[in-house]
Amino acid sequence: MKQSIIIALFATIAVMACLQMVAAVPAPVPEAAPGPVAEAEAYASPEALASPEAEPILGIITSLLKSLGKK
């Protein structure tokens, strides 16, 4: 009986220590996501259109414009 009380006491102390450690860590502050206008402005800059990553997108746009112009 005395042994189980001591084990329960140590378990309670361990749980309290874990809860204290969890409560001491501050929660991360979520960053605000950029708005759609700011994101669109970033993609519409001349530097973004001149980058090599934009070549496939520009190819799709030019082919769509060519196909629409033929009709």
Swiss-Prot record:
User: Which range is the signal sequence, renumbered to this chain?
Assistant: 1-24
Q: Which residues form the propeptide?
A: 25-54
How is expression of this protein distributed across tissues? Expressed by the venom gland.
Q: Which coarse location class describes where this protein primarily resides?
A: secreted
A Gene Ontology cellular-component term: extracellular region
- Give a yes or no for keyword Signal in this entry: yes
Q: Which cysteines are joined by disulfide bonds?
A: none
Looking at the UniProt entry, the stretches that span the membrane are: none
The processes (GO biological process) annotated in the record are:
defense response to bacterium; defense response to fungus; hemolysis in another organism; innate immune response
Residues with Leucine amide modification:
68
Keyword Signal assigned to the entry: answer is yes
What residue spans do the AXPX repeats cover? 24-27, 32-35, 44-47, 50-53, 54-57
Question: Which top-level group of life is the source organism from?
Answer: Eukaryota
GO MF, one term, reads: toxin activity
Location within or outside the cell:
Secreted; Target cell membrane
Q: Which family does it belong to?
A: Belongs to the MCD family. Protonectin subfamily.
This chain belongs to which protein, by name?
Venom peptide 2-long
**Native species of this protein?**
Orancistrocerus drewseni
